[in-house]
């Protein structure tokens, strides 16, 4: 086959492949099953000693679903689907030190197991064990200021978890 024919054949094959891919219905929005319109997000179980983390993380996940606009958050009785889970890890570890070996920052790591279920068809649509969010925060002069920064880090980790969960549960279909 001549070089010119080979180029035309390659171009034709590429165009055919592109047209076929375009007809596959690929969308950046995802293809959540049509019958799913609502989701319930019960308060996550907290298997750690960090009191209150479950409320902060659950609220962030509810807000992430609400912001996405893909599923309306409702009570369990009215839901087509449910996102449930548990917080399995909450660790604060030393991260950086200054030249005098004074602690300068921490890393907060929150670990969860989550599951997204279709209640109408009684099937698990997505689940993940060991979903992790990590946030660093600086040490402040006063202990109370450092605690306040840790609380802010928990909120940031919760936002990250919310984005990850909605990304997996809704946008990856």
Residue ranges and their predicted role:
Residues 28, 67-71, 82-128, 135-152:
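Surface-exposed short loop/turn segments
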Residues 6-7, 41, 84:
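Intrinsically disordered, low-complexity Ser/Thr/Pro-rich tracts
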Residues 4, 32, 102-104:
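Short, surface-exposed loop and linker segments with low hydrophobicity and enrichment for Pro/Ser/Thr
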Residues 13, 146, 158:
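Residue-level marker of regulatory loop/turn positions in helix-turn-helix DNA-binding domains and
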């Amino acid at each position: 086959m001549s070089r010119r024919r080979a180029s035309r054949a390659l171009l034709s094959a590429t165009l055919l492949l592109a047209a076929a891919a375009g007809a596959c219905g690929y969308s950046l929005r995802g293809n959540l099953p049509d019958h799913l319109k609502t989701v319930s997000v019960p308060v996550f179980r907290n298997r750690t000693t960090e009191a209150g983390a479950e409320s902060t993380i659950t609220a962030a996940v509810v807000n992430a679903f609400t912001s996405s606009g893909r599923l309306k958050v409702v009570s369990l009785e009215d839901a087509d689907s449910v996102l449930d889970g548990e917080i399995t890890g909450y660790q604060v570890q030393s991260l950086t030190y200054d030249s005098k070996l004074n602690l300068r920052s921490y890393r907060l790591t929150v670990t969860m197991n989550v599951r997204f279920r279709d209640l109408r068809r009684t099937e698990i649509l997505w689940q993940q064990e060991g979903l992790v969010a990590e946030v660093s925060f600086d040490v402040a002069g006063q202990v109370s200021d450092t605690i306040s920064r840790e609380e802010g880090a928990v909120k940031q980790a919760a936002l990250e978890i919310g984005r990850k969960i909605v990304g997996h549960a809704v946008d990856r279909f």
